[in-house]
Amino acid sequence: SIETIRKLPKMYFTNITGGEPFIRTDLKEIVRELYKKSDRIVISTNGFFTDRIVDLCKEFPQIGIRISIEGLEQTNNEIRGLQDGYQRGYKTLKTLRKMGMKDVGFGMTVQDKNAPDLVPLYKISDKMGMEFATASLHNSFYFVEAKNIIHDRPMVAKNFENLVNELLRSNSPKKWFRAYFNHGLINYI
């Protein structure tokens, strides 16, 4: 609630996630209150509600948006259970970039089903000049989920290794730090 947000201490970074944050009718109010508490806000979304996302970004152009795309088109749509999920997310990314949003990018939770898409999806994001954030499949105490398991760890690790090598080929220190983070994910899985 807004009252709860008002009680929060000062924060450096806030990630609004879900479920899907853009189904909330009070998301603008939440963001407005959080900016009183947080220096940086990023919203993780499936990118399905392009119009709502664009509307929020017009009011808060400094906000970060990460579209959760779980692989190339077929893989993403299978994992997300949305027939046009990839295209809708991709369209939202392009729309945000076209309107001048700077803190925009892909977010991918890596698992057995999508690990082979890790480097190809990174290359798409890199070509678009966007951020590429990764996470490893994990269980959550908050959602009482204990069946998220990576079954083929060597294969997933190899794909993370390939991503690390791609990131290290760049001239960007930020990408080198992302390589370090992704190398750490190999140990986590």
Language model: regions and residue ranges:
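Conserved alpha-helical substructure of the radical SAM core
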Residues: 1-63, 141, 152-159, 163, ...
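Radical SAM enzyme [4Fe-4S]-AdoMet core and its adjacent flexible, acidic
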Residues: 33, 37, 63-70, 74-189
